């Protein structure tokens, strides 16, 4: 019996375009396919060796025994590499028309013109467009697609690649390491502070597609950078897989903010590994917005290696019908006087399931370290569920740990108060939800906050009745 495509409903990015790819690998994962990917990219031998070792690890490693249901994920039915065009273009006019129309619908050219210092657009397996303001190059900033960085900055690339997330980290990190393609590479030199965001946009267009970008960010001593990524995919009757790896190195006194606003269709498995090493007095901020997908499993991680290092995660997860958002954070305190903050906001409706899963670890050398965790969940109906699963490891007695968790429903008193002032029940519920997520949206640049609020409103439509 043929599968029915999920209802597009109000998912505004559910459109898909005709296949315009110039190359598409066979479905399934084999040594031949991994070798073919590497040869098409004309990679050095060491990268091919890295990929093949990762593939062997992937075969050996077990599937996660926790989190959402992965039993329907068929690795043999996925296309692991699709090349949409011949080159990464620096001019928007030179991007193939079919691909350009997709990104025009998503507002990428407009976004670049208005408020971005640099932008990268990935379609399927490859970055099809990349541009950066010239003055940033003059400051020594490197912002390239990851494949170009491997070719053009190999020494710097090799120094940091897989140093934060090795292939052996987990099964999906091994998978990414074997078939990675695209992503962003950023290097910010010492004491260079970049205030305007750099942005990347990742789009899956094909059915049964796997997207495996690899992002690597290095903020040198005293540097600062703000990076924003967005993700969407069409609605199909069969599943797609997004399995990215993000590695970030925050050197002494440096600052990195990494913002994600994902709005995947509800046929996408979103299984991502994100980790940063934070050195002395460095500061790492994860700002993570999770909407859509069939299943998201994502836990941004800060490893606080230097004295005074700081890490924070501010996240929102919204699960609707048939969706599981299994998200959270990991804070690993390895040095004295380190600090971390986790603020998790979750919303579930129409039978959706949200799970906060977090780890805070205090090592023996982490004297004077402190961590604060806040988990708030808003459940909009009786069919939806929420779980909070914290795990704390403490190996010294000179630390501070605070954890607060709260689950609530939209109360009749709140609704009555608003409805008595002429507001409909649906509008009142929406107002309560928007107030609930305000601590998240206020941390976004204005244009992203507007988009996030709009996406939440789309998700909210039809919540009453």
From Swiss-Prot:
Gene Ontology biological process: iron-sulfur cluster assembly
Pfam families associated with the record: SUFBD_core, SufBD_N
InterPro entries tied to this protein: Fe-S_cluster_assembly_SufBD, SUF_FeS_clus_asmbl_SufB, SUF_FeS_clus_asmbl_SufBD_core, SUF_FeS_clus_asmbl_SufBD_sf, SufBD_N
Domain of life per record: Bacteria
Family to which the UniProt record says this protein belongs: Belongs to the iron-sulfur cluster assembly SufBD family.
Protein name as it appears in the record: Iron-sulfur cluster assembly SufBD family protein SERP0500
Organism lineage string: Bacteria, Bacillati, Bacillota, Bacilli, Bacillales
């Amino acid at each position: 019996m043929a599968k029915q495509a999920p209802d597009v409903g109000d998912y505004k990015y559910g459109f898909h375009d005709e296949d315009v790819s110039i190359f598409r690998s066979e479905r399934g994962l084999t040594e031949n396919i991994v070798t073919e990917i590497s040869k098409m990219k004309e990679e050095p031998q060491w990268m091919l060796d890295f990929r093949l070792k990762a593939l062997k690890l992937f075969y050996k490693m077990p599937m996660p025994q926790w989190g959402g249901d992965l039993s329907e994920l068929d690795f043999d039915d996925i296309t692991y590499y699709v090349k949409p065009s011949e080159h990464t273009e620096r001019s928007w006019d030179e991007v193939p028309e079919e691909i350009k129309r997709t990104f025009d619908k998503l507002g990428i050219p407009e976004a670049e013109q208005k408020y971005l210092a640099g932008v990268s657009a990935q379609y399927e397996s490859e970055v099809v467009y990349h541009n950066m303001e010239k003055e940033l190059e003059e400051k020594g900033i490197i912002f390239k697609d990851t494949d170009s960085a491997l070719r053009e900055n190999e020494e710097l690339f090799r120094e940091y690649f897989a140093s934060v997330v090795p292939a052996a980290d987990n099964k999906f990190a091994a998978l990414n390491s074997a078939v990675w393609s695209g992503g962003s590479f950023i290097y910010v030199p010492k004491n260079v502070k970049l205030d305007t965001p750099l942005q990347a946009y990742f789009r899956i267009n094909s059915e049964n597609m796997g997207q495996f970008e690899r992002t690597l960010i290095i903020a040198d001593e005293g540097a600062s950078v703000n990076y924003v990524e967005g993700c969407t995919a069409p609605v199909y009757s069969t599943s797609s897989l997004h399995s990215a790896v993000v590695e970030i190195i925050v050197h002494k006194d440096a600052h990195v903010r990494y913002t994600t606003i994902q709005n995947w269709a509800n046929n996408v498995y979103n299984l991502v590994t994100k980790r940063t090493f934070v050195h002395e007095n460095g500061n790492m901020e994860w700002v993570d917005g999770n909407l859509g997908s069939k299943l998201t499993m994502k836990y941004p991680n800060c490893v606080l290696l230097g004295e005074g290092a700081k890490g924070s995660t501010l996240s929102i997860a919204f699960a609707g019908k048939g969706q599981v958002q299994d998200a959270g954070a990991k804070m690993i305190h390895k040095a004295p006087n380190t600090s971390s903050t986790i603020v998790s906001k979750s919303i579930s409706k129409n039978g959706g399931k949200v799970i906060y899963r977090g780890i805070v670890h205090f090592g023996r050398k982490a004297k004077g370290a402190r961590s604060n965790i806040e988990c708030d969940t808003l459940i909009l109906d009786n069919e939806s569920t929420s779980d909070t699963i914290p795990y704390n490891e403490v190996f010294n007695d000179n630390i501070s740990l605070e954890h607060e968790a709260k689950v609530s429903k939209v109360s009749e008193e709140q609704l009555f108060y608003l409805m008595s002032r002429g507001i409909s029940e649906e509008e009142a519920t929406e107002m309560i939800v928007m107030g609930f997520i305000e601590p998240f949206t206020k941390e976004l640049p204005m244009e992203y906050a507007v988009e996030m609020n709009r996406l939440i409103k789309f998700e909210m439509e039809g919540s009453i009745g």
